[in-house]
Amino acid sequence: MHIHRTRIVITSSRDPSIRTRNFLNVLTFVLPDSVKITRGKKSKIEIFERAINLGALYLLFVLAKNGNPLRIIVYDLESLSIKYFFKLSGLSLPSDYNVSLNQIKGHSNVCIKLNECDFLRDFLVDMNMYNLTNNCDVVVNSRLIHTNICELLFMLTTKNIKFLKMILEA
């Protein structure tokens, strides 16, 4: 029997908007070995403790402003320090592409097809998206838009359906 290991815990700031909750759900589908924790009234310390108790390596926080996801902060749970910090300057969710979450569920084999963004390489590997085989349910392409600004595009390989786009600034 295969035991699922939690590698990444995903959460948000308190009282997230529907858009932020949807983004967290999509991240949970596309980041292998990840689990979402609802923040609720939990303190940051309680979230860290829960992630450590789950045996996770990373804690990914999505911070929002005016209901829109604005920043992604990834903590290394071994050193308890920030490992990655990105400003989210653009976001298209599955609903923006008329794709339902049910179409995305169960597609856990994520492969990097193209990576033009050096500053995202380690992040993608740490988020368990390093498979370079042809057995991919989802492919990720990263395209350099400007120095330290990159577009990440996620597509279902079965029908070449785009379902998630993020513009990340380092």
Swiss-Prot record:
Alphabetical list of Gene3D superfamilies matching this protein: Probable brix-domain ribosomal biogenesis protein
Keyword annotations from UniProtKB, A to Z: Ribosome biogenesis
GO molecular function: rRNA binding
GO annotation (BP), single: rRNA processing
PROSITE patterns from the UniProt entry: BRIX
SUPFAM superfamilies hit by this protein: Class II aaRS ABD-related
Keyword Flavoprotein: no
Record domain Brix: where: 6-170
InterPro entries: Brix (IPR007109), Brix_dom_Rbsml_bgen_prot (IPR023548)
Function: Probably involved in the biogenesis of the ribosome.
Protein name per Swiss-Prot or TrEMBL: Probable Brix domain-containing ribosomal biogenesis protein
Species whose genome carries this gene: Saccharolobus solfataricus (strain ATCC 35092 / DSM 1617 / JCM 11322 / P2)
Lineage: Archaea, Thermoproteota, Thermoprotei, Sulfolobales, Sulfolobaceae
